[in-house]
Amino acid sequence: MSTPSEPYQSEHLASEPPRASVDAAPGRVLLEFGAPWCGHCIAAQPALQHLLAGRDGVRHVKVEDGAGRPLGRSFRIKLGPTVVLTRGGLAQVGLVGRVSLLD
């Protein structure tokens, strides 16, 4: 899994990383599952960008999710947007659905 130059990643990855790569990543990884056409996913971006500002120790991985996508299924993702914060491959916290700066 490559390290982005900034904590916030504005585009979905062309292909999702394998679960083993996420599990082996050092430090914390914020996985964002959604789709570029999803209204709630788009609306969540300012809150996620604000959350990640100044947090160089967190990698943001934006994954387009859908039926048959193995990474999303491995975390039991059913609805977008869903964010999962992992450390050492273990989910530390997750948030499902609409997110705003007021949350």
Identify the residue ranges that each predicted region occupies.
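N-terminal leader/targeting and pre-domain segments
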Residues: 1-28
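Thiol-based oxidoreductase modules, predominantly thioredoxin-like and allied folds used
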Residues: 13, 33, 56-70
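The canonical Cys-X-X-Cys-His
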Residues: 38-41, 83
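Typically the conserved alpha-helix immediately C-terminal to a functionally engaged Cys/Sec
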Residues: 40-54
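Non-catalytic, surface beta->alpha helical segment in thiol-disulfide oxidoreductase systems
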Residues: 79, 84-103
